[in-house]
């Protein structure tokens, strides 16, 4: 019974800590002498090359080099990726392509490829492009 009571006290302490931590904001962390502020990890004199500093983990954002532009983002940061499919793929349907399809790169088929039929893709893109190129359903911006 004592171990069960101790477990309940520990769970209640975690819940109380979680509830009261929601009342404070991140202002204490980003205060003048906090973790990121004037004398903290991103300070210009003490740890100027820390987490938030211009040369720190955040990258070269102040100099116009976004973090995802040079290979930090998925697929090399510039939309490159490889897809390998092996096996028999029985696909039936109709294909209709209308409009502009900007594809740069090469397509290589190896082995016997028997293709007959057509494919039709209609609707919105599902790749995360939206208004201004972000979000679901908006056209690509090039």
Swiss-Prot record:
InterPro entries: Chorion. One of its GO terms (biological process) is chorion-containing eggshell formation. Residues 1-18 form the signal peptide. It comes from the Eukaryota. Keywords: Repeat, Signal. GO terms for cellular component: egg chorion. Belongs to the chorion protein family. This protein is one of many from the eggshell of the gypsy moth. This is Chorion class A protein Ld19. It comes from Lymantria dispar. The lineage of its organism: Eukaryota, Metazoa, Ecdysozoa, Arthropoda, Hexapoda.
């Amino acid at each position: 019974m004592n171990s069960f009571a101790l477990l309940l006290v520990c769970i209640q302490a975690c819940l109380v800590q979680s509830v009261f931590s929601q009342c404070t904001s991140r202002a204490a962390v980003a205060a003048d002498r906090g973790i990121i502020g004037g004398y903290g990890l991103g300070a210009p004199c003490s740890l100027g090359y820390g987490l938030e500093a211009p040369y720190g983990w955040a990258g070269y954002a102040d100099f116009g080099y976004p973090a995802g532009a040079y290979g930090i983002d998925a697929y090399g940061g510039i939309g490159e990726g490889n897809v390998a499919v092996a096996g028999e793929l029985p696909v039936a349907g109709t294909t209709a392509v209308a409009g502009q399809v900007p594809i740069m790169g090469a397509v290589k088929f190896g082995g016997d490829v028997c293709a007959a039929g057509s494919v039709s893709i209609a609707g919105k893109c599902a790749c995360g492009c939206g208004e201004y190129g972000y979000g679901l359903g908006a056209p690509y911006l090039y």
